[in-house]
Amino acid sequence: MSQKFSYSFPVFAGQAPRIDALKDYPGEYTYKYPKAGYPNSKVEVRTYDIKSHVTRTMKLPLDADGYIPRIRFTKDANKLAIMTLNRHQDRFDLYFADPRSTLCKLMLRDESPYYIKENIFDNIQFYPEYFSMLSERDGYSHLYWYSMGGNLIKKVTNGKFEVKDFLGYDEEDGSFYYTSNEESPLRKAVYKIDKKGKKTKLSQQAGTNTPLFSKSMKYYMNKFSSLDTPMLVTLNDNSGKTLKTLITNDALKQTLSGYAVPQKEFFTFQTTDGVKLNGWMMKPVNFSASKKYPVLMYQYSGPGSQQVLDTWGISWETYMASLGISWYV
């Protein structure tokens, strides 16, 4: 990327000026989010030319109450990627802005009858001739491959499962790497699809796998855990072969073996609308079906907040269950 330009967001601090007299003692605090009836934040993207010291505002066709959730550098110094959302967050636009002319060109639009998930922004990666995109346009989160001109090259993944993370593209052999919940909505595994479309599962253990690939895409460090397995960290090559085990947590497992730790149990249930959902429960260690116990339920249901996962952890809920309280999620 050219070093001639730097990019920044003006930060909205409210319509009223700050009160300097209150800076040393508790007083009024100015929030960037307006209350009902007050004007919405006005956002822009600007570039600053280091040589000429000129600041330019990009001619971005953004709704007056729209959002700019991300800006990203591409491999082309004349193409700054700007991502926008409308106020209802059900329409996503990707623009390429020229930092000198300030012109912005719409490269793609993705819409949802519900809302656009945040992980879409963070899974867009740019290469010299292509860029990646996650979309739920067919009802499931899948990986799409575009030219830098905004043309769809191909849909990389297919099926009744969700791609969770796009890990990267090997420019040498044309392979794509990603994680998905193809095995189970509770789990996350690592996959590779080569340029001929052949899919290979790289992770060996069932649970939650979180890989971090090298820049060359030849190696990755994998963090794995499951309901009954604390985090295991390994170094792997891009065929999935384990080259070295970095962290085993054997000492932790040995220590925990001396305690009666409440364990999560997975279950499924069906809503009145016929939708099958997953849940977990945690009972006291010496649970007896003939006794009555206080029950607590954890519930959030916000976007991007999946709570029922095949992953390891000890939490406040574990402590409360050890006191004789049952939990449901």
Model-found features: residue ranges?
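Short loop/turn segments that connect beta-strands within beta-propeller blades
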Residues: D49-H53, D98-T102, S147-N151, D194-G197, ...
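Structural motif
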Residues: K4-P10, K42-E44, Q89-F96, G139-Y144, ...
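Predominantly five- to eight-bladed beta-propeller fold
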Residues: M1-T57, S239-Q254, Q307-W316
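Short glycine/serine/proline-enriched coil/turn segments at secondary-structure junctions
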Residues: R87-Q89, Y115-I116, E183-P185, L227, ...
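Serine-hydrolase catalytic core recognition
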Residues: A77, N209-V329
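Conserved beta-propeller blade repeats
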Residues: M1, A21-Y25, Y29-E44, P61-L85, ...
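Glycine-rich, acidic and aromatic/proline-enriched surface loops and short helix-turn segments
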Residues: E44-S52, S101, D273, Y298-G302
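Beta-propeller fold detector
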Residues: R56-K59, C104-R109, I153-N158, T200-Q204, ...
